[in-house]
């Protein structure tokens, strides 16, 4: 249940980045535009997004690996000691992969939620930046995971309706 809530909060976080907010409506799995699946982790894999077609429109399957034990010793140890850190990793992975579902590419800016570690970087520091905003689990929903660039890219892809 907890991870499912984190995924719902990640969807809500993206929806709030547009004006008006994107509307997220649950629907049948077979026709859903975005589907989120929890899967066993591949070594070092946080998640992935795969595009697909549904009724002639682009859709996405998001796969999240919630087991932090396979994400390297530093991440695994910190997640064992700090449940909010573990949930931060899962939440930010959901946000990142959902970003791909909305059409955002990887970036090389460490401050972006769409940053890719292919450019290197400190994995723990990346997640701790968000974790440090949290005092309690419910704070995950309230703290923004986005850089200005993340928000700007989404607003570019989904411009305000009725404005040109």
Set out the residue ranges of the language-model regions.
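Metzincin-family zinc-dependent endopeptidase catalytic domain
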Residues: 3-110, 119-122
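The catalytic-center signature of Zn2+-dependent metalloproteases
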Residues: 84-162
């Amino acid at each position: 249940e907890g991870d499912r809530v984190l995924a719902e909060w990640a969807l809500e976080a993206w929806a709030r980045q547009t004006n008006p907010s994107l509307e997220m409506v649950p629907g049948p799995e077979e026709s859903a535009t975005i589907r989120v699946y929890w899967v066993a982790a591949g070594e070092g894999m946080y998640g992935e997004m795969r595009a697909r077609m549904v009724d002639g429109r682009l859709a996405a399957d998001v796969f999240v690996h919630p087991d932090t034990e396979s994400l390297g010793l530093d991440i695994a140890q910190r997640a064992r000691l700090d449940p909010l850190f573990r949930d931060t990793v899962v939440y930010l992975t959901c946000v990142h992969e959902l970003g791909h579902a909305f059409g955002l590419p990887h970036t090389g800016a460490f401050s972006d939620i769409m940053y890719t570690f292919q450019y290197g970087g400190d994995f723990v520091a990346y997640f701790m930046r968000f974790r440090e905003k949290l005092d309690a689990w419910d704070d995950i929903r309230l703290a923004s995971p986005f850089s200005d660039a993340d928000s700007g890219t989404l607003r570019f892809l989904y411009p305000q309706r009725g404005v040109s």
